[in-house]
Design a protein with these regions (language model features):
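A polyampholytic, Gly/Pro-enriched intrinsically disordered region
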Residues: 145-157
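Flexible, glycine/charged-enriched surface loops at secondary-structure junctions
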Residues: 11-13, 61-69, 127-130, 153-156
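Conserved phosphate-binding/catalytic loops in two-lobed NTP-binding clefts
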Residues: 115-140
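Active-site metal-binding loops of divalent metal-dependent hydrolases
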Residues: 102-104, 130
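Short glycine/serine- and small hydrophobic-enriched flexible loop segments
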Residues: 4, 53, 142-147
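Phosphate-binding/catalytic loop of phosphoryl-transfer enzymes
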Residues: 1-18, 169-172
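A short, charged, Gly/Pro-tolerant segment at domain boundaries
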Residues: 155-173
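A contiguous, well-structured pocket-lining segment that forms one wall/lid of small-molecule binding clefts
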Residues: 17-98, 107-121, 148-151, 168-173
Length: 173
């Protein structure tokens, strides 16, 4: 939604990231998500609303919106919300491996911040190649389509519980 406000094409993740790279940011002060009593929870609705309101206010008062700076400050606000929570989750669980995936893992600011935070914490970070960091829903749907074509159809008793531990996947590499 932030990409749409900035006039970027859909899907907006990659265009927003490219636009953000054109600025050092620090121009717009955007809110960070905070949920009292739930240090791992987050919501980006306030951030989205802030971007929309900022863009509309800037237009209403006749000022020019620095689209690149807003893209950068938005991406940094997402990263500043996400990365500390990921690190806190590692701390709470005692784990030393973090994996990021999906569209959010394609963002260069988030990737860089995760790399620095994991290096500082002495944990391993797994990031898929950028070409594999797309919309997870689309990937799951595409795989489901090919499974269906191959005749692999599950009945209604199928659940979403993992049947293989991530450690097995990590050790397979």
């Amino acid at each position: 939604k932030a990409a749409r406000v900035l006039g970027l094409p859909y899907p907006g993740g990659a265009p927003l990231d490219r636009l953000a790279q054109q600025s050092q940011g620090g121009v717009y002060r955007l809110p960070l998500s905070h949920v009292d009593g739930a240090p791992l929870d987050m919501s980006f609705s306030g951030l989205k609303t802030a971007v929309v309101n900022l863009a509309h206010h800037t237009q209403q008062v006749g000022e020019e919106l620095d689209r690149a700076a807003l893209a950068r400050d938005f991406a940094q606000a997402v990263s500043d919300t996400l990365v500390p929570r990921a690190m806190e989750a590692l701390r709470q669980t005692g784990r030393k491996v973090l994996c990021a995936a999906g569209g959010v893992a394609a963002n260069s600011i988030i990737r860089g911040d995760l790399e620095r935070a994991c290096a500082k914490a002495g944990c391993r970070l797994y990031l898929p190649p950028l070409r594999l960091c797309g919309d997870n829903g689309a990937m799951i749907g595409a795989q489901g389509y090919y499974e269906y074509l191959a005749g692999h159809v599950a009945d209604m008793s199928l659940n979403a519980y993992a049947t293989r531990a991530i450690e097995a996947e990590i050790n397979a590499d």
